Amino acid sequence: MKCNACWRELEGQAVSTTCGHLLCTEDAKKILSNDAACPICDQVLSKSHMRPVDTNPNDDWTNMSMAGVSPQILMKSAYRSVMFYIGQKELEMQYKMNRIVGQCRQKCELMQAKFTEKLEEVHTAYQKMAKKCQLMEQEVENLSRDKQELQEKFAEKSRQKRKLDEMYDQLRSEYESAKRSAIQPANNYFPRAQPDLFSGVPNIMDSSDPLRQGLAGLPETPGRRDEGWAPPPRQRRSTSGPFELSAGSPAHNAAPPVDIRPRQPARPVFGTAMNNTSAALRNMIISPVKRPQLSRNRPHMFT
């Protein structure tokens, strides 16, 4: 048997109440001194409602207390005693169940608090991951937009490259055609007007000097005379544009200058006594005739 207030094992003396509960002597004194209420059913108790009992009576007390009692009363007393015992066991089981339920409730509260904290952490992590996913989606969208722009730029650059390749091929073909036309045979050149070397002979023959009349047809002394034959002026090469063949050759545009000044009669090469026409003709055949030379710096005359 256990006390219904402190649930300790009862040994020896105990206190029984009229409401059917069993208390130890210490708890009974506390109840009487405080509010005088039963801790189980809250019934008001007084000293008349309590009675001391012996939880472990000896044989002498059992024989003396049961002597002279009818069996009906004994059976009734035994029934009440058994019901009291069953009630005490039920109270004891209920106390144990309440204690276990309290412990389980406490554990559940601790687990609930722990899992609530974990759930909050998971929810916080989920919110962070959701924000990160949004940022990643925006980054993917920006990268897709950049990829599309780069593809458009690449297509434009490819189109420009194809156009440049076509222009390069066209210029290369034009250059090859110009190169082939530049190495054409000499019969395609324009003829250049040759100066008349004997244009001044009649004027010389009309001179009053008989010596000059005899030597009027003689050519000049072999050798170069810069004062008589000046080199033709150089044609300025235009640097304003590429080489064009459609504008015409330099020989076609400007004819070489011809010296039309009257030449001075040359001195006789074979002596001063040669006054006849046969000697002059002989000297003309023997002596080389000076012809104008082309300048190396003159541009090529071709079509």
UniProtKB/Swiss-Prot annotation:
Question: Native species of this protein?
Answer: Oryza sativa subsp. japonica
> Which residue ranges are recorded for the region named Disordered?
201-268
Where is this protein localized, as stated in its record? Answer: Nucleus; Chromosome
Q: Which Gene3D superfamilies match?
A: Zinc/RING finger domain, C3HC4 (zinc finger)
- Molecular-function annotations in GO: transferase activity; zinc ion binding
Query: What is the main EC category here?
Result: transferase
So which domain of life are we looking at? Eukaryota
The organism that produces this protein has a lineage beginning with: Eukaryota, Viridiplantae, Streptophyta, Embryophyta, Tracheophyta
Give the disruption phenotype, in one or two sentences: The mutants hei10-1 and hei10-2 have normal vegetative growth but exhibited complete sterility, due to shrunken and inviable pollen as well as sterile female gametes. Reduced chiasma frequency, with a random distribution among cells of remaining chiasmata, but normal early recombination events and synaptonemal complex (SC) formation.
Query: Which residues lie in coiled coils?
Result: 119-184
Recorded catalytic activity of this chain's protein? S-ubiquitinyl-[E2 ubiquitin-conjugating enzyme]-L-cysteine + [acceptor protein]-L-lysine = [E2 ubiquitin-conjugating enzyme]-L-cysteine + N(6)-ubiquitinyl-[acceptor protein]-L-lysine
Q: What is this protein called?
A: E3 ubiquitin-protein ligase CCNB1IP1 homolog
GO CC, any one term: chiasma
Described by its record, this protein's role is as follows: Ubiquitin E3 ligase required for class I crossover (CO) formation during meiosis.
Q: How the protein assembles, per its UniProt entry?
A: Interacts with ZIP4 and PTD.
Q: Pathway, according to UniProt?
A: Protein modification; protein ubiquitination
E.C. designation(s)? 2.3.2.27
Q: Corresponding gene?
A: HEI10
Q: Zinc fingers (RING-type): give the ranges.
A: 3-42
What tissues express this gene product? Answer: Expressed in young panicles.
GO biological process: what's one of them? reciprocal meiotic recombination
Task: Give the keywords, sorted.
Answer: Chromosome, Coiled coil, DNA recombination, Meiosis, Metal-binding, Nucleus, Transferase, Ubl conjugation pathway, Zinc, Zinc-finger
Q: Where is the major localization of this protein?
A: nucleus
